[in-house]
Amino acid sequence: MRIVLITQKEPFYLAENISYLLKKLPKESKIVAAVIANPSPFGNKESFLNKAIRTLNIFGLKFFIFYSLKYILNFFRKSKNVETILKKNNVSIIKLEKSINHKSSIEKIKSYSPDLLVSLQGNEIFKKPIIELAPKGCINLHTALLPEYRGLMPTFWVLKNDEKFTGVSVFFVDEGIDSGPIIVQEKVKITNQTQRELIIETKQIGMNLILKAIQKINSNDFTLITNDDSKKTYFSFPRKSDVEEFIIKGKRFF
């Protein structure tokens, strides 16, 4: 099964996740190419400067310094570079000049004859032509127990809201936000993890679930779980007041 990966240059966790995925991918499946968007590690797609200013204003100086140093250090580490990892594993890089939904982008991806698209932190909402490009569909990973906690930064919100459990879901992409039918899902217990620890834990579980979903799709052996709109909750980018409440409750980012 031929797979095209849609991802981004996220500098903190993603390269190691993709490296693991490539090592564990079943022999009957192959990632033949990848689309790599510019980094958007905390949600909204915007300029680097605006992202930095907004992160500082909302999350505070300590958070800003921690992730700024991580960003700078990881810039020089090959193990943290998504494109380097993919090229090392002989995955072709698809360069897009327009939005992924643009006709020219769709034609470039189509030229690799993918059976399945896999989105890992893709930072655009996909429209119908890209969703329907591959015969076996397009799947995505969300680090929450869908239909709850759709949207941005679910690890932040589950900690802030004092949840006892969260989860990881792999689902078929539709034109909504985290709203497609679920292929595989796993519940995760929340104890005293920091947000960073919970991100690392759920992303690792997510890679194993992506592998499981790929096997199920390839063998056409899966039963979809309803992603019930009537039970959905949705969260966007946190406000400063949300971060203040997070800290007052004794929650930790790292």
Where are these regions (language model features)?
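One-carbon transfer enzymes
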Residues: M1-F254
